[in-house]
Amino acid sequence: MPLAAELKSRGLPITRSRRAIAEFLDASTAALSAIEIIDHLHSQGITVNKTTVYRELDILEREHLVVELDMGDGLKRYELSPRQHHHHLF
């Protein structure tokens, strides 16, 4: 199930930024940092601040829809949880 649909099924409102983050995570072939998500959204003309992206990622993690990864480079990255999983390249 697409991430945005899963959020909706859990009763969470689907804001423009939440939908955009969910769609980018769904389409990604790699685990993403918050900065990569912000840069992508800005390139798509979606204005979102860093706090919003971190808040959304926190919600997705609390709902067990994404997992936080530590790749050893000091950046936290996020990918779909195993229940939402599709293959990512590291």
What annotation goes with each model-predicted range?
Residues 63-90:
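Non-DNA-binding regulatory cores of transcription-related proteins
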Residues 53-63:
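Basic amphipathic alpha-helical segments that dock to polyanions
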Residues 14-17:
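Short helix-coil-helix linker/hinge
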Residues 27-33:
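Short capping segments at the starts of secondary-structure elements
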Residues 36-42, 53:
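A short acidic, leucine-rich amphipathic alpha-helix
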Residues 19-24:
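Pre-recognition alpha-helix immediately N-terminal to the DNA-recognition helix
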Residues 1-11:
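Short, Lys/Arg-enriched N-terminal segment that forms or immediately precedes the first helix
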